[in-house]
């Protein structure tokens, strides 16, 4: 078994050392990613780019953890302090700093996790599509399938060969969004009331079996506490697919995209 992990940082380098220490004692288990940074302001800054590029080489990171482009504000106690007047965290994908970062990181040949939620499709799809086209040799991974619809997932995956998605948090509908308009824009979850894969999602998982990755989004203590339950839920989901498809999504695609060498 392997698990891909990255630190979550509200200041540059926060929690990075702790994860490196954890990896030092679990090298056969952990696949390291560069830290996710929460405090980008409208664009990616030079200090983030410099530090991330340096540490990709220093620590042999296999991917860049989530670049937080869009994130709708949630209405729950764990998100207090992260509400915004606009109802979202937003980092413009067409920014100069984003382009500068990708020009440099694309030479490292590792994927970049691109956290984009599809609640403002008309604004964001043209910009992200251009971004993916501008950097055809850079692999991008969209977590949670963007919480989008089958139609949106199909359009992105069929248009851009260099874009992949994780299936984390897609077992059920996205909830707890403060803005009801944004809430209404999220796509459906995978499962019906009988815990069976909806036909429209099953078609997507089979058609794009080479571009989808299992993930749990175990980013806080409450997610780790139910980690085993999350894994069981997704085993039940993948067991509803042909075996060769489930193996790709469960681990084979991750081995390829993170360049994991089996011992």
Label every model-predicted segment.
Residues 12-19, 45-50, 93-99, 124-126, ...:
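Well-ordered, non-membrane alpha-helical segments in soluble/globular domains
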Residues 24-28, 86-214, 242:
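Catalytic pocket-lining loop regions of alpha/beta-barrel enzymes
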Residues 6-9, 33-37, 66-70, 114-118, ...:
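Active-site-proximal beta-strand/loop segments in catalytic clefts of secreted hydrolases
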Residues 3, 32, 64, 105, ...:
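Divalent metal-coordination and catalytic microenvironments
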Residues 1-3, 199-213, 219-263:
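Mid-to-C-terminal alpha-helical segments outside catalytic/metal-binding sites
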Residues 15-111:
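Active-site gating/metal-coordination segments in enzymes
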């Amino acid at each position: 078994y392997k698990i891909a992990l990255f630190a979550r940082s509200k200041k540059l380098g926060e929690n990075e050392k702790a994860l490196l220490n954890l990896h030092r004692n679990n090298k056969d288990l952990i696949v390291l990613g560069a830290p996710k940074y929460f405090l980008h302001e409208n664009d990616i800054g030079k200090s983030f780019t410099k530090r991330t590029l340096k540490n990709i080489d220093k620590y042999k990171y296999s991917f860049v953890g989530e670049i937080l482009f869009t994130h709708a504000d949630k209405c729950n106690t764990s998100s207090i302090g992260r509400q915004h007047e606009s109802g979202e965290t937003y980092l413009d994908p067409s920014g100069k700093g984003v382009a500068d970062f990708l020009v440099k990181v694309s030479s490292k040949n590792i994927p970049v996790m691109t956290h984009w939620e599809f609640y403002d499709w008309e604004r964001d799809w043209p910009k992200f599509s251009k971004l993916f086209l501008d950097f055809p040799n850079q692999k991008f991974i969209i977590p949670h399938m963007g919480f989008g619809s089958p139609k949106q997932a199909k359009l992105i995956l069929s248009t851009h060969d260099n874009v992949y998605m994780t299936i984390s948090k897609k077992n059920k509908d996205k909830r707890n969004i403060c803005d009801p308009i944004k809430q209404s824009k999220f796509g459906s979850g995978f499962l019906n009331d009988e815990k069976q894969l909806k036909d429209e999602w099953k078609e997507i998982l089979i058609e794009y079996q080479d571009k989808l990755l299992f993930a749990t989004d175990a980013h806080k203590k409450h997610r780790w506490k139910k980690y085993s339950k999350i894994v069981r839920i997704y085993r039940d989901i993948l067991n509803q697919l042909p075996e060769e498809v489930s193996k790709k999504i469960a681990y084979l695609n991750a081995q390829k995209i993170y360049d994991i060498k089996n011992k």
